Amino acid sequence: MYTKIALLGLVGSAAAFNAPMMTVRRDAIATGAAAAVVAPMLRPAGAAMKKDSKAPCVEVFDERDGCKAAGTQKASGDDGFCVKVSMKAIGFNAAEAASVTKNYGIKRFGAKSV
């Protein structure tokens, strides 16, 4: 319902827009260029990237312990699995990163083998 209302409002506003005849194409392009220059400066502070280095971690728990039940199971949706998704801080270990770079010959982003 809300989608239809939003779409109707969008179509109505587009139909109601009528550029004045005295507007010159050059003025319209200059206004658009000025808006493109100013737009990045008007971003809200909340849009900045967080620097806490958290990433989603997915854990899957199996209550069956890897055992299958005797006979055939019907697809009831109760398969004995549980999924946990949480945000965890991801640490940086410089020694491990250097080891991976050295052992796998990775040369990206200026990383050099030690």
Swiss-Prot record:
Keyword annotations from UniProtKB, A to Z: Bile pigment, Chloroplast, Chromophore, Electron transport, Membrane, Photosynthesis, Plastid, Thylakoid, Transport
Binding site for (2R,3E)-phycoerythrobilin 3: 64
Pfam families: Phycoerythr_ab
Listed GO CC annotations: chloroplast thylakoid membrane; phycobilisome
Membrane topology of this protein: Peripheral membrane protein
InterPro entries in UniProt: Globular_prot_asu/bsu, Phycoerythr-like_a_sf, Phycoerythr_a
Record's subcellular location: Plastid, Chloroplast thylakoid membrane
Binding positions for (2R,3E)-phycoerythrobilin 1 per the UniProt entry: 52-53
Maturation and modification: Contains three phycoerythrobilin chromophores with binding mediated by both the alpha and beta subunits.
Family under the similarity heading: Belongs to the phycoerythrin family.
Misc. comment: The light-harvesting system in Cryptophytes contains phycobiliprotein complexes. Unusually they are composed of either phycoerythrin (CPE) or phycocyanin (CPC) but never allophycocyanin (APC), with only one type of biliprotein being present in any one species. Unlike cyanobacteria or red algae these proteins are not arranged into higher-order phycobilisome complexes, and they are found in the thylakoid lumen.
Assembly notes: Heterotetramer of 2 different alpha chains and 2 identical beta chains which form 2 alpha-beta heterodimers within the heterotetramer. The two alpha-beta heterodimers are rotated to an open configuration in contrast to the closed configuration found in other cryptophyte species due to the insertion of a single amino acid, Asp-65, in a conserved region of the alpha chain. In the open form, the central chromophores are not in physical contact but are separated by a water-filled channel.
Name of this chain's protein: Phycoerythrin alpha-1 subunit
Originating organism: Hemiselmis andersenii (Cryptophyte alga)
